[in-house]
Curated annotation (Swiss-Prot):
Its EC number is 2.4.1.-. It comes from Arabidopsis thaliana (Mouse-ear cress). Keywords: Glycosyltransferase, Transferase. One of its GO terms (molecular function) is UDP-glucosyltransferase activity. This is UDP-glycosyltransferase 79B2. PROSITE patterns: UDPGT (PS00375). It comes from the Eukaryota. Belongs to the UDP-glycosyltransferase family. GO terms for biological process: anthocyanin-containing compound metabolic process. UDP-alpha-D-glucose binds at residues 266, 325-327, 342-350, 364-367. InterPro entries: UDP-glycosyltransf_plant (IPR050481), UDP_glucos_trans (IPR002213), UDP_glycos_trans_CS (IPR035595).
Amino acid sequence: MGGLKFHVLMYPWFATGHMTPFLFLANKLAEKGHTVTFLIPKKALKQLENLNLFPHNIVFRSVTVPHVDGLPVGTETVSEIPVTSADLLMSAMDLTRDQVEGVVRAVEPDLIFFDFAHWIPEVARDFGLKTVKYVVVSASTIASMLVPGGELGVPPPGYPSSKVLLRKQDAYTMKNLESTNTINVGPNLLERVTTSLMNSDVIAIRTAREIEGNFCDYIEKHCRKKVLLTGPVFPEPDKTRELEERWVKWLSGYEPDSVVFCALGSQVILEKDQFQELCLGMELTGSPFLVAVKPPRGSSTIQEALPEGFEERVKGRGVVWGEWVQQPLLLSHPSVGCFVSHCGFGSMWESLLSDCQIVLVPQLGDQVLNTRLLSDELKVSVEVAREETGWFSKESLFDAINSVMKRDSEIGNLVKKNHTKWRETLTSPGLVTGYVDNFIESLQDLVSGTNHVSK
């Protein structure tokens, strides 16, 4: 693609689920000849540098994350702390403003992409730059945040769906996010998001109109500014990396589509009793299974938290793993037939691209909305039933898995048919590149009207 070449400064929130989608987009921009300066904490550099496909066009710069009372000394990323302490890390991010201004002065970008650093538009204005609020959660999540305080389960006026909502029984997902800190740490998450949306020059969302067009229109109307879509921005398949030999060997012992794979993301830490119930539910399926979760609260290892006698009973067909796994490669293995997921936004796209049946057990508010989008709106998955406390039983987990894995299951056939349709849509030739090309053209138009100010 020809036209104006521009330089973007990206400053994502210090969470893997934010930094990696920013970098996926950076790769798409760099592929077209644009330059990206990517600002992240030092600890995140090792994790991300191997995902940089264009190191000549994408340059990492590190920020020093100041210490904030209440956080362990040296904390730089969300993965190091409980989710309830994220507000403290956001406060630490706010303290990097001087460093960001120094980088802007040094590299002279044309645009700044950001998400939770709500003060970026103020910085950009001082330098005569335009800003892009890049949303890497679902459009439905953002749409639901624009009119807070309503009754759970009741769509506010103009909201585009009666299905993609938090219901009364989902109140537990909000409690999971409530801060346990007594220190005044500035704006809360909702305030950061809404301020960023209102003060940015444009809003960009990592989604496709085919999936969330009605929510994107709602956001554009409510915020009274242009909403650009990048498309799903899938990472390029890394043909040089293969699935770890331990999993290749283990999976090769099972029939196609027979293994149940469960992964709940890097943020989710279950209570011990819920962790054990998860394990027992997987055992009930009678299927071979792999569960990849962090050790539960109060346990330093997976093994010490397993139900009594569990390892012996599932020996040879069940594995519970407490470390990172190659989720996309596992989902593409022919033996894996069902994916039990928390439905984080990244995992949502990975599940849609897979051939697996999808069972969802969300833990946080945005994951619930993603789940409703897939289960109730698109009808490509099944949600695990749970109580108002958020508790799900081994029986409800078994029922959900069985409903999609059982031969001749009516619901299993329905979600498989719908899933196939949406997967074919998302992988249709030209869809992703079309979104990226249109997005870049919109950025070129934005930059061409920018007047830089030297400082």
